[in-house]
Amino acid sequence: MTNSNRIKLTWISFLSYALTGALVIVTGMVMGNIADYFNLPVSSMSNTFTFLNAGILISIFLNAWLMEIVPLKTQLRFGFLLMVLAVAGLMFSHSLALFSTAMFILGVVSGITMSIGTFLITQMYEGRQRGSRLLFTDSFFSMAGMIFPMIAAFLLAHSIEWYWVYACIGLVYVAIFILTFGCEFPALGKHAPKTDAPVEKEKWGIGVLFLSVAALCYILGQLGFISWVPEYAKGLGMSLNDAGTLVSNFWMSYMVGMWAFSFILRFFDLQRILTVLAGLAAILMYVFNTGTPAHMAWSILALGFFSSAIYTTIITLGSQQTKVPSPKLVNFVLTCGTIGTMLTFVVTGPIVEHSGPQAALLTANGLYAVVFVMCFLLGFVSRHRQHNTLTSH
């Protein structure tokens, strides 16, 4: 693979995460305007965004098999066509059914693109470099999550219709589409070059189960925590502005942590540092949940920084459980994480209703403790060390 080709594929991976980050995180900014547009209460409008999450979940799950049937370049180019249709549907339709369909299509496109982006990084880089590259790729999710809400705020403040926010997000996919030209993608399944060597049936091992449970519990814990921090902070007498600042500080610290750990991870065994970070995150979340408002700002900054590398390291370790990176395995771990996203309000909503926001935060804390236990148990069964040794010879 030429260096320029590798750079193009790496940028496609970066932008695939930016696309998903923009679509998921911008929801809160535009929901009120979309509710007004359809003359609906915000509470019932929020349910239609489940179509976006469902599209992401289904496409990540199915793409484990689709990757071996449909070439990656074809998928990305077809995704561009779907993106244009979805944004056009948002712009020219006043039907709630068509809006929900367009949201589902956006979810499908983003899920397919993100799973391809993740697979490309696991295919092109090995060992500890894979972990640091995946972490840097994941930082584009947070970066888009900071940039696009600002773009949305600017457009909405200037009385520009909400659907132009999605047109701006579509420009990210235009860049991905342009990068596919003159770019060679790894061939998979029936398109892969034929070899005389017998195909080994891949055995995943129990380590994949531990990592999948950790991925689900981590995302469910993280989103369950950050979704209810504002309500919890307001209950302690903080202003809405200060409560919002806590969330902003978390994501800012999270992004800085990703950049820092993309360098730091190269010097450590991934399973050991993952166990340490998961333990630290559980402790820091407990400090936040039981501390005074005066200490909240510092504990949430520390939590954002030290938890930033956990999810990506889980995916990296998953990809290292087999000799050759398996798209099915990587997508399985990603799917478990996405299920965590889908379950966020299903799990935390009733808890808040019965016991208040702090109960939801303590539940999230318990989920982080489960992540620590899974990472610790992984140390006894993980195959990443033997596969790293094989690839380094």
Curated annotation (Swiss-Prot):
Q: How does it sit in the membrane?
A: Multi-pass membrane protein
Q: Does the keyword RNA-binding apply?
A: no
Q: Which cysteines are joined by disulfide bonds?
A: none
Extract the Gene3D superfamilies matched here: MFS general substrate transporter like domains
Record's CDD domains?
MFS_FucP_MFSD4_like (cd17333)
Where is this protein found?
Cell inner membrane
Q: Output the Gene Ontology cellular-component terms.
A: plasma membrane
Q: Does the keyword Cytoplasm apply?
A: no
GO MF entry, a single one: transmembrane transporter activity
| Cited InterPro entries | MFS, MFS_dom, MFS_trans_sf, MFS_TsgA, MFS_TsgA-like
Q: Which Pfam families match?
A: MFS_1
Query: What keywords does the record list, in alphabetical order?
Result: Cell inner membrane, Cell membrane, Membrane, Transmembrane, Transmembrane helix
Segments spanning the bilayer are 11-31, 51-71, 78-98, 101-121, 140-160, 162-182, 206-226, 245-265, 273-293, 297-317, 332-352, 361-381
List where this protein forms a coiled coil.
none
The record's PANTHER family line, in alphabetical order, gives:
L-FUCOSE-PROTON SYMPORTER, PROTEIN TSGA
- UniProt cross-references to HAMAP family, sorted A to Z: MFS_TsgA
**Recorded family membership:** Belongs to the major facilitator superfamily. TsgA family.
Please give the name of this protein. Protein TsgA
| Originating gene | tsgA
